[in-house]
Swiss-Prot record:
Pfam families: Ribosomal_L28. InterPro entries: Ribosomal_bL28, Ribosomal_bL28/bL31-like_sf, Ribosomal_bL28_bact-type, Ribosomal_bL28_sf. It comes from Prochlorococcus marinus (strain MIT 9312). Gene3D superfamilies: Ribosomal protein L28/L24 (2.30.170.40). It comes from the Bacteria. GO terms for biological process: translation. GO terms for cellular component: ribonucleoprotein complex; ribosome. PANTHER family: 39S RIBOSOMAL PROTEIN L28, MITOCHONDRIAL, LARGE RIBOSOMAL SUBUNIT PROTEIN BL28M. GO terms for molecular function: structural constituent of ribosome. Belongs to the bacterial ribosomal protein bL28 family. This is Large ribosomal subunit protein bL28. The lineage of its organism: Bacteria, Bacillati, Cyanobacteriota, Cyanophyceae, Synechococcales. Keywords: Ribonucleoprotein, Ribosomal protein.
Length: 78
């Protein structure tokens, strides 16, 4: 199961963990993904999506259909 947002394509970021003594080690910063069942008004059906919490906040503000179109995602495949 890949940890990629199905609406935005957001995926893990490579970062550094820095200790108190300033020793740096590589760290993988994962996306906060949630499995959500969202109502798609235009298609008149429920859509099951793995979505990041940042994208979920935008969907609640703008709407699922408008947000998906702005990101070039076809909701018919879900």
């Amino acid at each position: 199961m890949s940890r990629v947002c199905e609406l935005t394509g957001a995926k893990a970021n490579n970062g550094m963990a820095v200790s108190h003594s300033h020793i740096r080690t590589k760290k993988l910063q994962q996306v906060n993904l949630q499995k959500r069942r969202l109502w798609w008004e235009e298609g008149k059906k429920w859509v099951n999506i793995k979505i990041s919490t940042k994208a979920l906040k935008s969907v609640q503000k703008v709407g699922l259909d408008k947000f998906a179109k702005s990101n070039g995602v076809d909701l018919k495949k879900f």
